[in-house]
Design a protein with these regions (language model features):
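Divalent metal-binding segments
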Residues: 80-129
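Metal-coordinating catalytic core of metallo-dependent amide/deamination hydrolases
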Residues: 132-193
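Active-site gating loops and adjacent loop-to-helix segments of metal-dependent hydrolytic enzymes
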Residues: 71-100, 153-165
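N-terminal metal-binding scaffold of metallo-dependent hydrolase/deaminase domains
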Residues: 1-42, 52
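Divalent metal-coordination and catalytic microenvironments
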Residues: 9, 26, 31, 51, ...
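Domain-wide signal for the mature, well-folded portions of proteins, strongly enriched
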Residues: 9, 19-21, 49, 90-94, ...
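Short secondary-structure capping/turn micro-motifs that flank functional sites
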Residues: 7-8, 127-128, 153-154
Length: 193
């Protein structure tokens, strides 16, 4: 059993419109929060963060990693215009492994340095770039669900898969590679479910 306690100033919101600030110890057992105490638990290693604020991590349920480089831009455009002018041209660059590696390195670095501890992340339709993102997230110690996109219509030729069958084949290749690399927790290997 991996047990330790964090000592510090804890902030949380136990109810809407309620901010709680407490000094004390958070007992952690096997990666789970097991309890809070104002006194140090006996016989447990204490990691002392006195003077530091400790908060619950945030979960981002909808992130597009390849869009990170231009987030907050062109807010005057409607969605479809924004996709055509910004998103599709940028995401097409992720076919280049070196471009994907560099672009995702900025995204992963900044995500790691944020309060986000878990995320659901969209990559691109490029299998190898999607695997690169997953590799970087794992290397940074971040936990995420990552999705490979599939597109065979309603986007420019530079950013679409040649056909639905080709997209399915690439998605299977992505899943098989993830499974072989043990990147899918709980994956059963049943392609029909």
């Amino acid at each position: 059993m991996n047990t330790f306690a964090l000592k510090g100033t804890f902030l949380d919101t136990p109810a809407p419109d309620t901010l709680r600030v407490r000094e004390g110890y958070l007992l952690c057992e096997n990666g789970l929060c097991a309890g809070f105490s104002e006194t140090a638990p006996a016989g447990v290693e204490v990691l002392d963060y006195t003077g530091k604020i400790i908060t619950p991590g945030l979960v981002d349920l909808h992130l597009h990693a390849p869009q990170y480089s231009y987030c907050g831009t062109a807010m005057d455009l409607e969605l479809l215009d924004w996709l055509q002018q910004y998103t599709y041209p940028e995401e097409a660059h992720y076919a280049d492994p070196a471009y994907a590696r560099l672009g995702y390195s900025y995204f992963v670095r900044d995500l790691k340095n944020s309060a986000t501890t878990r995320a659901c992340i969209f990559a691109t339709l490029h299998t190898d770039a999607t695997l690169e993102l997953m590799h970087q997230l794992r290397g940074a110690g971040l936990s995420a669900f990552v999705g490979k996109l599939g597109m065979d219509r309603n986007s420019p030729d530079s950013y679409r898969e040649p056909s639905a069958a080709a997209g399915l084949a690439e998605t299977r290749r992505w899943l098989d590679t993830c499974r072989a690399g043990k990147m899918l927790s709980g994956w059963t290997g049943d392609r029909d479910n």
